């Protein structure tokens, strides 16, 4: 029988695909069911964030960062706040640092719960998302009680945080931690030993460590390949150097290892939260939560009713904003998805001259072709799930 040359088959994966995480469009070239080439088409959620920030004062630019990785909003604000603080050369008081660390870890748990449980859903398990979202709901309420918003918080401001936390809220966060370990154990027992989940994730999307560095990976993507690289340990910011926690590291660099790391990171985050809660209710119970320089941080309402000086400061801050000394700075935080960096250039005015955002998901998505080659079509959604991509930060 004569051999016939079969043409490769091109299909669109997304943008309306349930496993495509928002607005991702992948053009897949398939040979039968084997993926030969992946071409990610991005930009469907591009809003021009970096350009818009140039027309806003340093304070007005904060809410834009919530809308990048909108699964864990405060972690993005954190990098921006650190960048502005470095240019201004100001310190954040200890209580403010602890509140920031506490809420950064809440963000990490929010992110990992979503990722782990929806990854399980992508490969066919329907119970984990229901359990995970129940816990996320409680954490969203903590967000809301701190700043009034469930998602777009604008709570971390240059100089500290917007307002202090009431003791009752900190106690409630403390009460949430122990039952959460039980929830994690239930999730662990349900997903980790599951035969189907293992078959869908073990040896899928393997990344060697040198490849991970070459592609510009960070966060869970390099830790899954065996590097104990975590900015909270390697370049500590805020008060992470005083916290006790471990960095989980994988061996095989596959989807399953990355899942296990995210599970363990949630436990470590809860550990850090416990330490923060104890300090905030103990030796750091009273104290300022933001810098006391009223040329940068607005004065309290009570002061404005008594002092003309405070009223003038407030008026200047919310009309013109503060001027940041000329210079440039790069500040990075260990966001849940990897290294989130803000490269800020100031020309001495009240608005950023340029603000470049380094989104971890962008670097991870570019390797989609490299990761998927030779895998089956069904593995594409498993690999995509383990990359942990949110389009707000990829398209910006």
UniProtKB/Swiss-Prot annotation:
Its EC number is 7.1.1.-. It is found in: Cell inner membrane. One of its GO terms (molecular function) is NADH:ubiquinone reductase (non-electrogenic) activity. It is an enzyme of class 7 (translocase). The keyword Zinc does not apply. Keywords: Cell inner membrane, Cell membrane, Membrane, NAD, Quinone, Translocase, Transport, Ubiquinone. Its main location: membrane. Signal peptide: none annotated. PANTHER family: NADH DEHYDROGENASE [UBIQUINONE] IRON-SULFUR PROTEIN 2, MITOCHONDRIAL, NADH-UBIQUINONE OXIDOREDUCTASE 49 KDA SUBUNIT. HAMAP family: NDH1_NuoD. NDH-1 is composed of 14 different subunits. Subunits NuoB, C, D, E, F, and G constitute the peripheral sector of the complex. NDH-1 shuttles electrons from NADH, via FMN and iron-sulfur (Fe-S) centers, to quinones in the respiratory chain. The immediate electron acceptor for the enzyme in this species is believed to be ubiquinone. Couples the redox reaction to proton translocation (for every two electrons transferred, four hydrogen ions are translocated across the cytoplasmic membrane), and thus conserves the redox energy in a proton gradient. This is NADH-quinone oxidoreductase subunit D.
